[in-house]
């Protein structure tokens, strides 16, 4: 692969590379999971509208590939979570990161854009920044929740941090880090008022039947820890509500296989559940209540205006380390509760995440229209807060950075 045209003064981290003609823009992007793949695809499309001849290389998933990414590796190679879980794959991840660094140095792109995956991307960004490559980190780590010291580390790694949530730039300002709120692209993917009937028709669901969506995670480890309990919860809810239907979107083929195996073992009535290939968006719009693993799915359910119950269970040793090291800065885990600043949706974490507790929370929401209404009304307010331009705003901030010789703060 030939080097990207242009030369740079590599004598210091602040050295600005030569800015080539727009037609020859080159961007390297690295995303490590399904949510990053979604953000990366939107960003590629927005950047291409500015630079029609641009080239995009790096690590991404199916959405980024469809948007035009030349993939060096699939995003799943980076998808690992937890302090303990990463250890068996550490050598592989370090080797992969070294290869991405070498490729990026050879190409010398207009910008390297790390999308989330901070434990993989920040060290990589720091080395590329030192080589005179402009670096952008898209999606702030959850510094408002744990390991706030990462905010200072980002300033050493990234020339620019693109924040999805409005409370984040103020944290970075305390560390002198350039950070911009660009809004969350998912806020533009859902209307403020959503309709249920078209989604149900698309999935072949009865218009008047109660529907529960199950989203146990987009990682195999999450499905292993939560999938069986989610299905057991669904079985108990179905016993209480004989007309209850289930929709279960699988993030990818591996997740589908894992979920299918759990469904086979659970022996739920086949006529009452649907396992979907992706299509979480439609599943959320079709349902009445969502039971999901904490993460981006909670934000998507919030934006779909669907009442939800959040659950999560990490590996026991990771949980003990987090508690022992006092890494957590918040007693709220899900984005709806963090954004609302209160316990808006039920959260059942670690020891509290049991089948009886999950079942009670799900049935309480399914059976209480006023409780659902309280969540939905607040979801509408929070949706408005997250509008900021999304992918277009992110592309504009990147364009401003690469087109300025010094790079604006």
Where are these regions (language model features)?
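Nucleotide-activated sugar donor-binding and catalytic core shared by glycosyltransferases
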Residues: 1-409
């Amino acid at each position: 692969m030939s080097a990207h045209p242009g030369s740079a003064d590599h004598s210091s981290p602040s050295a600005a590379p030569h800015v080539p003609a727009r037609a020859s823009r080159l961007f390297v992007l690295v995303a490590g999971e399904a949510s990053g793949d979604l953000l990366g695809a939107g960003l590629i499309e927005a950047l291409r509208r500015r630079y029609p001849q641009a080239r995009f290389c790096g690590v991404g998933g199916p959405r980024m590939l469809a948007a035009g990414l030349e993939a060096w590796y699939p995003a799943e190679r980076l998808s690992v979570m937890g302090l303990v879980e990463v250890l068996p794959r550490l050598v592989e991840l370090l080797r992969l990161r070294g290869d991405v660094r070498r490729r990026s140095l050879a190409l010398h792109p207009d910008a390297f854009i790390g999308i989330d995956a901070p434990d993989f991307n920040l060290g990589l960004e720091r080395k590329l920044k030192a080589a005179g490559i402009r670096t952008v980190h898209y999606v702030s780590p959850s510094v408002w929740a744990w390991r706030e010291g990462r905010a200072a580390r980002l300033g050493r790694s990234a020339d620019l941090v693109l924040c999805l949530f409005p409370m984040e730039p103020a944290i970075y300002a305390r560390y002198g880090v350039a950070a911009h709120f660009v809004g969350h692209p998912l806020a533009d993917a859902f209307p403020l008022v959503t309709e249920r009937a078209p989604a149900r028709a698309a999935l072949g669901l009865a218009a008047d039947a109660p529907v529960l969506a199950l989203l146990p995670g987009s990682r195999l480890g999450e499905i292993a820890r939560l999938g069986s309990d989610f299905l057991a919860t669904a079985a108990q809810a179905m016993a209480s509500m004989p007309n209850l239907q289930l929709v279960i979107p699988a993030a990818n083929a591996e997740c589908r296989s894992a979920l299918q195996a759990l469904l086979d073992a659970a022996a739920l009535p086949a006529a009452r559940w649907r396992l979907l290939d992706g299509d979480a968006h439609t599943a959320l719009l079709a349902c009445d209540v969502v039971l999901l693993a904490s993460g981006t799915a909670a934000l998507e359910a919030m934006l779909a205006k669907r009442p939800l119950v959040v659950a999560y269970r990490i590996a026991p040793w990771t949980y003990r380390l987090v508690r022992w090291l006092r890494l957590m800065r918040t007693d709220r885990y899900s984005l709806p509760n963090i954004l609302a600043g209160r316990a808006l949706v039920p959260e059942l974490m670690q020891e509290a995440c049991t089948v009886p507790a999950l079942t009670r929370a799900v049935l309480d929401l399914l059976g209480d229209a006023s409780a659902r209404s309280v969540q939905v009304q607040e979801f509408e307010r929070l949706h408005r807060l997250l509008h900021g331009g999304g992918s277009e705003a992110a592309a504009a901030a990147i364009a401003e950075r690469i087109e300025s010789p010094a790079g604006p703060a």
